[in-house]
Amino acid sequence: MILTFIKIKKYRIKYLIIKKQKAFGRNNLGFITCRAKGGGIKRNLYKILDSNFANYGMSFSSAFYVNIIYDSFRRIFLAVYFIINSIIKNIYRYFLLTKNLKIGSQINFGFKAPLKIGNALPLYKILLGSFIYNIEIRYKGKGSLVKNANHNAIILMIGDIYVTVKLPSGEIKLLLKNLFCILGQLEIRRKVNKNIKKHAGFNRKLSIRPKIRGAAMNAVDHPHGGGEGKASVGFKFARTLWGKAFKGIKTRKKNKHLSRFILQHRL
């Protein structure tokens, strides 16, 4: 029965693909919030990921891993899942690719799912020292943490209310024990040792625009600007275009209400 799913020719599913336009470093008002961004190769087809964990097993509780697909917007390959027990027939979903997961294997979702690589489970059901990814922050929300290639989190301790998790950045955080995640590690995208920056203007294809130093500007345009000749910055710490200190200063707000759940800040 599994072999019949693998015989499908194309996995470019129309109802899971949308047109997405880049922001080019602008916000909703059109002002530049991130400098030196713009241009690049045109990529319209954005594949929608299912990060809802199948509504905790209510919409469907199991699926088959069918095939691997390339995604130009992410640094990781995607897995195509064929949903089994759903109300609507012939449904496919895109998920992040789990390491050491074989094509044709069955994936389960929900509180009753067994301890198996690729399954979506609550945090309190997973063993200590296990690798997890695609972790929720809020209950019945979407998976938000650890979604990039070759990044994994580790469960350190399970308590009555909270679970202690170590993130890839080195931050140790408390999360509610009923939050969902996926058991296993994320697959690594293979890199080829090839010099891709061999032509002039290749950075423009990577959406990198020329960046002008602040010291080369006038005093009106940048905090570092102005002065006769090669003048110094004039501050103890370097400043951004909007006057905010950076390079050696922590910019996280001290009175953030989520800071009490951080046991150890990132390195």
UniProtKB/Swiss-Prot annotation:
One MF annotation (Gene Ontology) recorded for this entry: transferase activity
Q: What is its main location?
A: plastid
Ribosomal protein found in the keyword field? yes
Record keyword Ribosomal protein present: yes
Query: Where, per UniProt, does this protein localize?
Result: Plastid, Apicoplast
Name a Pfam family for this protein: Ribosomal_L2
For this record, an example GO cellular component is:
apicoplast
> Which BP terms from GO are recorded?
mitochondrial translation
InterPro entries with a match to the protein in the record: NA-bd_OB-fold (IPR012340), Rib_uL2_dom2 (IPR014722), Ribosomal_uL2 (IPR002171), Ribosomal_uL2_bac/org-type (IPR005880), Ribosomal_uL2_C (IPR022669), Ribosomal_uL2_CS (IPR022671), Ribosomal_uL2_dom3 (IPR014726), Ribosomal_uL2_RNA-bd_dom (IPR022666)
SUPFAM superfamilies assigned to the protein according to its UniProt record, in alphabetical order: Nucleic acid-binding proteins, Translation proteins SH3-like domain
Alphabetically list the UniProt keywords.
Answer: Apicoplast, Plastid, Ribonucleoprotein, Ribosomal protein
On subunit structure and binding partners, the annotation says:
Part of the 50S ribosomal subunit.
Please state which protein family the record places this protein in. Belongs to the universal ribosomal protein uL2 family.
Q: Output this protein's name.
A: Large ribosomal subunit protein uL2c
What gene, per UniProt, encodes this protein?
rpl2
